[in-house]
């Protein structure tokens, strides 16, 4: 039975670590995301803190003795808690037998309004239902099959930083993964398939009061269906390892904007995504050369062919009163787009690992990673018809000037089908050192123990894809610029004895738009986190208590001015701040536990510099994080 569980864990590791190509472009993220929150997977569900896009404290990394309950391989587990007036609960059942293992999980979140540090109410909230079903079959040591289904539904997700709310988001994910061969990947074929069904609806009237019947009521609906397949083969020979693979993805993406009418059918007046279909073909190879016990080199290559077609490129709406995406792209980028674009990307990464002892590891990475723009960056065709039609007569110009003053840049987000590949050329240095008796934070074999390390990254980016404003009419456009990105991370963890520990980490990031000689937008400020923790035993189990001090410096560099750039950054949110959390936990013999804490104990009023990202809000308003608040959760394993 233990061996079967090891199969399941190793199979997961294969698909998340070794199975991921080192040179894959997915490691590069957009400068500003606008997507639903991450999925709540079964391994996270029992220790999960309700997600708040306006509070970036990393409370999921705090030490709690209840984690042992949450991670135990028990047949049935429950958690339920109240977090600052919001509720989260989850149930998980899991099983394993001689040739089969599985898990079933359900979760529910009801997030409500909260007050900031000044006592002001913040219009925050959502309802979320999540679930997962996983079944694994291990007929023998050379075969494993795994079936997974994930469901995530988010309703009434308020977006106080944006002009529209996300009234409904659903994600259904079906996965099949299989292994044929040795589980240690000596001679193994892995293959699988995945289907993702994503639906979203955003509007400005379902969750907020409409001030006037004459107010524009936009409704955006998005449908996306993604099929992908992969095949990869691993071979171990003479202490070396090679993995070669192929993947194919078909992405069907539709997004429509409507003018909502109270007493008539909704009328489509723009394309968020003009019926885009994308075929992505990838081949990749990872080759690891083990020179000796201390030295190893890994070379990774990835080649991608991306063929995209905007099927509604020539579709004019409302009997031609609203122009087609082709005409919109031509107006803003001056090139006639035929609806098709084929791009190729070649990426490579070289990693050198030096492991002088079992407690030391150093790494050096040199990479050239290319990212092709996503569907919204390349094909969004949201526009304002009042601004699109140039005025000609004096009366039209007068009316246009009056409307332009109030509608500058609104409802206009124009993708760029002619974007070049984003090319990241970076060097990365990493180090990790620990004592021989260090098993983890607050976990030592004996006496005191430590771990510390860090990472330095310098990235010279050619053709970084950014959003910008067109000063003519305020429209959001997408363009390429050259940029420099630098980041430094450091961490240290020290267990003074079996009962007491401390950890500290710091991160600094610098981003410069070299083409325009200005700062990149949405670059996180310097931040330090310090945790002090204590744990001990009592007659019925264990307990812990701890504190976290989070200090964020003032961000002096940003894209603050709509007259010279995008203007997405806000000076009010660029102020520095410091907050403190206190927390504690009880564990009764690994069967029942409680987790409680007080966040922002000094009731500090502040807002995060990195704005909310559940939707693509390119002109966000300031939303303050929660003030002082309390949480209490219960955890059980049967």
Where are these regions (language model features)?
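Membrane-embedded beta-barrel scaffold of Gram-negative outer-membrane proteins
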Residues: 100, 190-204, 355, 361-367, ...
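Flexible loop and strand-edge segments within Gram-negative outer membrane beta-barrel domains
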Residues: 111-118, 122-128, 142-226, 255-259, ...
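Short strand-turn segments of transmembrane beta-barrel domains in outer membranes
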Residues: 37-95, 104-106, 120-124
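C-terminal beta-signal and adjacent terminal beta-strands/loops
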Residues: 19-23, 35, 39, 49, ...
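Transmembrane beta-strands of outer-membrane beta-barrel pores
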Residues: 48-50, 80-84, 97-99, 108-112, ...
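Gram-negative outer-membrane beta-barrel transporters
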Residues: 293-294, 306, 445-462, 478-560
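Outer membrane beta-barrel strand-and-loop segments of large Gram-negative receptors
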Residues: 132, 218-222, 226-232, 276, ...
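Transmembrane beta-barrel wall of Gram-negative outer-membrane proteins
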Residues: 84-110, 119-155, 165-188, 231-239, ...
């Amino acid at each position: 039975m233990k061996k079967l569980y090891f199969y399941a864990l190793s199979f997961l590791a294969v698909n998340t670590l070794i199975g991921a190509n080192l040179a894959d472009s997915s490691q590069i993220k957009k400068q500003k995301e606008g997507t639903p929150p991450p999925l709540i997977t079964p391994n996270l569900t029992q220790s999960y803190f309700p997600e708040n896009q306006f509070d970036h404290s990393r409370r999921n990394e705090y030490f709690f003795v209840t984690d042992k309950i949450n991670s135990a391989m028990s047949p049935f587990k429950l958690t339920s808690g109240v977090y600052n007036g919001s509720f989260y609960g989850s149930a998980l059942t899991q099983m394993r037998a001689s040739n089969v293992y599985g898990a079933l999980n359900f979760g529910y979140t009801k997030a409500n309004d909260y007050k900031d540090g000044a006592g002001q109410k913040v219009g925050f909230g959502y309802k979320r239902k999540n679930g997962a079903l996983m079944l694994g079959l291990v007929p023998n040591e050379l075969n494993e099959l795994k079936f997974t289904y994930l469901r995530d539904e988010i309703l009434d997700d308020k977006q106080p930083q944006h002009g529209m709310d996300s009234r409904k988001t659903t994600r259904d994910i079906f996965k099949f993964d299989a292994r044929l061969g040795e589980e240690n990947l000596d001679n193994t074929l892995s293959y699988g398939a995945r289907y993702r069904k994503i639906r979203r609806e955003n509007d400005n009237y379902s969750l907020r009061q409409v001030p006037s019947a004459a107010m524009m009521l936009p409704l955006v609906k998005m449908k996306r269906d993604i099929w992908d397949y992969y095949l990869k083969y691993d071979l171990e020979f003479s202490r070396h390892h090679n993995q070669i693979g192929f993947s194919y993805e078909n992405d069907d993406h539709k997004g429509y904007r409507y003018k909502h009418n109270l007493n008539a059918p909704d009328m489509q007046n723009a394309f968020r995504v003009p019926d885009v279909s994308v075929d992505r073909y990838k081949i990749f190879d990872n080759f690891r050369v083990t020179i000796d016990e201390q030295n190893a080199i890994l070379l990774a290559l990835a080649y991608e062919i991306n063929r995209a077609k905007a099927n509604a490129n020539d579709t004019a709406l409302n009997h031609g009163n609203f122009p087609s995406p082709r005409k919109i792209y031509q107006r803003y980028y001056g090139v006639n787009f035929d609806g098709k674009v084929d791009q190729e990307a070649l990426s490579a990464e070289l990693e050198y690992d030096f492991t002088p002892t079992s407690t030391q590891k150093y790494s050096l990475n040199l990479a050239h990673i290319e990212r092709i723009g996503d569907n919204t960056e390349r094909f969004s065709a949201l526009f304002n018809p009042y601004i699109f039609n140039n005025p000609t007569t004096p009366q039209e110009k007068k009316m246009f000037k009056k409307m332009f003053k109030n509608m500058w840049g609104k409802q206009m987000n124009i993708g760029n089908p002619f974007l070049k590949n984003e090319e990241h050329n970076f060097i990365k240095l990493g180090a990790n050192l620990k004592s021989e008796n260090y098993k983890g934070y607050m976990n030592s074999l004996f006496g005191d123990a430590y771990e510390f390390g860090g990472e330095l990254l310098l990235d010279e980016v050619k053709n970084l894809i950014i959003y910008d404003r067109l000063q003519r009419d305020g429209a959001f456009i997408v363009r390429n610029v050259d940029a420099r990105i630098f980041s430094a991370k450091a961490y240290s963890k020290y267990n003074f004895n079996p009962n007491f520990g401390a950890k500290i980490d710091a991160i600094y990031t610098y981003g410069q738009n070299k083409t325009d000689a200005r700062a990149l937008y949405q670059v996180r400020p310097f931040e330090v986190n310090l945790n002090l923790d204590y744990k001990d035993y009592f007659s019925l189990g264990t307990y812990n208590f701890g504190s976290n001090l989070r200090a964020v410096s003032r961000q002096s560099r940003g894209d603050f001015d709509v007259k010279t750039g995008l203007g997405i950054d806000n000076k009010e949110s660029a102020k520095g701040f410091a907050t403190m959390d206190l927390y504690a936990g009880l564990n009764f013999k690994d069967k029942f536990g409680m987790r409680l804490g007080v966040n922002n104990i000094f009731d500090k009023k502040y807002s995060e510099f990195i704005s909310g990202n559940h939707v693509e809000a390119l002109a966000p308003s300031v939303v303050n994080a929660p003030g002082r608040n309390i949480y209490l959760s219960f955890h059980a394993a049967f």
